[in-house]
Amino acid sequence: MTSLFHHVTVLLKETVDGLNIKKDGTYVDCTLGGAGHSEYLLSQLSPEGRLFAFDQDDIAIRHAQQRLERYRGQFTIIKSNFRYLKQQLALYGVHEVDGILFDLGVSSPQLDMPERGFSYQHEAPLDMRMDREQTLTAYDVVNTWPYEQLVKIFFQYGEEKFSKAIARKIEQTRKQKPIETTTELAEVIKEAIPAPARRTGGHPAKRVFQAIRIAVNDELRAFEEAIEQAIDLLKPGGRISVITFHSLEDRICKIAFKQASETPHLPPGLPIIPDEYKPKLKIITKKPIVPSEEELQHNHRARSAKLRIAEKL
């Protein structure tokens, strides 16, 4: 199992060191995955320090428990979507923390296990669920969602300029018979895109597969909800590190940090600024941190990663 779950952690030191670790602090890894960030973070803590880590994937959780065995008693793994951050931490009596991190990339093992249906490069049933107990799958999206809804998700979540043509082709194909596998879907997408456009910009199915994955797991709304909760949970001086992999996630992070770090326009002449209008955050990374050339040589999947860090005031 461990060999199956090999995951190269992106921006490892930059993300964890950016939290300004307090040895006896309480920290949250919202995206446990391969446990690389969690393992390095735990190595920085004293025996009094605590880590809470979230994941929805049973295989990732089992692997992480093995990998983090030497820190037993210092960490708690919570099987939950991070959109329930506050609610889940409250069950452990935790209402404020010293640092929180998000790594929003899909774990490489999830991409590489053909049966998970995340990848257009392996034949597999259309699944794409991060949480295997969830009922909605990629098969449902592809075969039952109406044309208009498919156009919307391909355009909004995949930034796919041929959204209408692809949705139309899917609609035509599924009338004959259901689209059941990743390779069938990839072929339908390829046929819908004009030949000249197929020669540029990577695999023609990439954007649509991303869009379907985001829709199946409601990823963007979950992150919007979680980042607001994360900012609230931080103690003064506590920090948040966020790694994003595409412009949609990065935009959500940028807006959340910007809104929390600005003072709204108030009437002139107020003697003091009321607490609820004071900025909550100071942005640490004016520009996002990106992987070094050296890291990219070892891990090509890190290419689109961006790290943003902010501190609670």
From Swiss-Prot:
Reaction catalyzed: cytidine(1402) in 16S rRNA + S-adenosyl-L-methionine = N(4)-methylcytidine(1402) in 16S rRNA + S-adenosyl-L-homocysteine + H(+)
Role, per record: Specifically methylates the N4 position of cytidine in position 1402 (C1402) of 16S rRNA.
Gene3D superfamilies: Putative methyltransferase TM0872, insert domain (1.10.150.170), Vaccinia Virus protein VP39 (3.40.50.150)
EC number: 2.1.1.199
Family: Belongs to the methyltransferase superfamily. RsmH family.
Binding positions (S-adenosyl-L-methionine): A35, G36, H37, D55, F82, D103, Q110
This protein's name: Ribosomal RNA small subunit methyltransferase H
Native organism: Anoxybacillus flavithermus (strain DSM 21510 / WK1)
GO BP term (any one): rRNA base methylation
Broadest EC class assigned to this enzyme: transferase
The keyword tRNA processing is annotated on this UniProt entry: no
UniProt-listed InterPro entries: RsmH, SAM-dep_MeTrfase_MraW_recog, SAM-dependent_MTases_sf
Localization in the cell: Cytoplasm
UniProt-recorded Gene Ontology molecular function terms: rRNA (cytosine-N4-)-methyltransferase activity
Keywords: Cytoplasm, Methyltransferase, rRNA processing, S-adenosyl-L-methionine, Transferase
